[in-house]
Amino acid sequence: MAGRKNSTFAVTKVRLGNGLQVDTRADTVAGEEPLEIRTGGQTITTTMRTPGHDIELAHGFLHSEGHIASLSDVTEARYCAGATVNGMNTYNLLDIDLAKKNVLDLSDLRLTTTNSACGVCGTSSIEALTKQTRYQIPHIPVDPYVVAKLPDKLRAEQKQFKKTGGIHAAGAFTLDGEPVVIREDIGRHNAADKVIGHLLLEDRLPADDLILVMSSRASFELVQKAAMAGFGMLVAVSAASSLAVETARETGMALVGFARGDRFNLYSGELA
């Protein structure tokens, strides 16, 4: 699995600095493969992800979508053998056995292919989210000195980004800024689901004493996932969308964007 997180290709690099310079050499590219998640023999979703921590990804996705509430809701998660005509296991098909067979209404399930850019976007409203959220979002004052250090701490743990330059990261940090878990994926939504899935598997939800840090922009979808997991603060290195800001304010979540160096934007919440 580790070898599939990235691939090596012959790449022609072109520079125009001091005249045209062309150099062909081996370069590392972030891995991207489909992961189909099934339950009861039916497909829940297919997401384009970077292989690795797929069990966490599946648990995090199901929790973020409101399909499971705790680890006990899943009895088994396993890769499907015989995924090709030759009987090979591609590790791209994951079967999830649920404790309650009727926890998902498969007849009404939104079957989607989730790309690595935006995931399942725009399918929920703020009102629906506030009704669906299981946890009370904690009020966490934003400590500017802690927040300012979080992006660099996240970047320091991005091993695949250092190799490829093309992969997102999500991390759960303590309120003092110490890392609890960091995951990487070509899709920011997958990286967040992997973190949430890890916390679920470790019985660490709700994450009301943790901060979710993203190496991306802050979209509605990421605020949604953070709220479903009980985070009281989301920190992103890039901009926040209008719906993300509105959702954070409605749920009471602190939302930080453009966290770079010694500055950031506070879209929702208050300073400590």
Q: What do these predicted regions represent?
A:
Residues 1-170, 174-175, 179-182:
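Intrinsically disordered, low-complexity regions enriched in acidic/Ser/Thr/Pro/Gln residues
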Residues 52-54, 62-63, 186-187, 196-200, ...:
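Short, solvent-exposed amphipathic alpha-helical segments in soluble enzyme
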Residues 125, 146, 150, 166, ...:
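General structural feature for long, well-ordered alpha-helical segments within catalytic domains
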